[in-house]
């Protein structure tokens, strides 16, 4: 069971971001095809980076009892793929959340500016 610890933490974290995404319809629950394409492309790019790092001797898999031991390629554990997918989706959710917050702030500011002032009845 301890061999699944890291993967379990990743899955729980991924689920938390999916809940946030679902609640505010930020990425996968707003445009599922676009989000899937972005996450897939990002994971492919990052896995390519990992493979190049392994080949050049910069990256290697550390030994630990907390990982499953499943490898998708030499020196690249299954948990790495899950982490890269999580990281990619997290980036989409963060970018969409910041964009929505900025839009909301701008719209609120514009709405306040168009209302008449309480004191003079003039627009600000």
UniProtKB/Swiss-Prot annotation:
InterPro entries: Lycopene_cyclase_dom. This is Putative C(50) carotenoid beta-cyclase subunit A. Its main location: membrane. Involved in the biosynthesis of C(50) beta-cyclic carotenoids. May have C(50) carotenoid beta-cyclase activity and produce the C(50) beta-cyclic carotenoid C.p.450 from the C(50) carotenoid dihydrobisanhydrobacterioruberin (DH-BABR). It comes from the Bacteria. May form a complex with LbtBC. It is a multi-pass membrane protein. One of its GO terms (biological process) is carotenoid biosynthetic process. The keyword Cell wall biogenesis/degradation does not apply. Keywords: Carotenoid biosynthesis, Cell membrane, Isomerase, Membrane, Transmembrane, Transmembrane helix.
């Amino acid at each position: 069971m301890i061999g699944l610890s890291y993967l379990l933490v990743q899955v729980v974290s991924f689920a938390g971001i999916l809940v946030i995404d679902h609640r505010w319809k930020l990425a996968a629950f707003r445009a599922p095809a676009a989000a899937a394409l972005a996450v897939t492309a990002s994971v492919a790019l990052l896995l390519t980076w990992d493979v190049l790092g392994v080949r050049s001797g910069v990256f290697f898999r550390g030994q630990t009892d907390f990982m499953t031991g499943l490898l998708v390629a030499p020196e690249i554990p299954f948990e790495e793929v899950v982490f890269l997918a999580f990281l990619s989706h997290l980036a989409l959710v963060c970018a969409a959340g910041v964009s929505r917050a900025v839009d909301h702030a701008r719209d609120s500011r514009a709405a306040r500016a168009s209302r008449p002032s309480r004191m003079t009845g003039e627009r600000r």
